[in-house]
Amino acid sequence: MIDQIINYNKTFVSQKGYEKYITDKYPDKKLAVLSCMDTRLTELLPAALGLKNGDAKIIKNAGGLVISAFDSAMRSLIVAIYELGVTEIMVVAHSHCGACHMNYDHFHQEMIARGITDETLNTIRKCGVDLDSWLEGFKDTHTSVRKTVDTIKTHPLVPKDVVVRGFIIDSEKIGRAHV
């Protein structure tokens, strides 16, 4: 699959398909969107929010969560604020999210089946990583959005004038965003 993508890219570049996407690194709307990496949102999310290329920084991860005050999602938001001029942040979760109800036992079985040994997992634990928590999903989408919004709003490095709001989008039917 990667070879097919690279071959497509060669054609894309040679035909200058990139020209209509040229913009600078600063988001025109001074907006960052933290959302889930779900493939249903790839085109739906920007379309449902009326965003075009260059309007916003879109940060994606499993569940659209900030799971720690100093995780990579939070780091990206801090960079967006201080380096890219972001003044508003939308946390956008979605219905029927795969990260909801994730559990370590499932991941453990899949890892073992794919050749990761218990010895490796135990070594990671001995290094202080709580794999159970790290791979745990959330039980309620509304609660996860509120928690993420609160983590961002109360972060010691986020200025008080940055607007942070949370939404849930219907990823299967209408693309409607609601609080």
Residues covered by each model-derived region:
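Conserved beta-strand-loop surface patch within small alpha/beta domains used
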Residues: 15, 19-74
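Short beta-strand segments
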Residues: 34-36, 60, 92-94, 167-170
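Ordered, amphipathic secondary-structure segments that act as subunit-interaction surfaces
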Residues: 82-94
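Gly/Ser/Thr-rich loops at beta-strand to alpha-helix junctions
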Residues: 37-40, 95-99
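Short secondary-structure capping micro-motifs at structural edges
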Residues: 74-81
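Structural motif
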Residues: 30-32, 56-57, 87-90, 165-166
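Divalent-metal-activated hydrolytic enzyme cores
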Residues: 1-29, 64-69, 81-84, 99-178
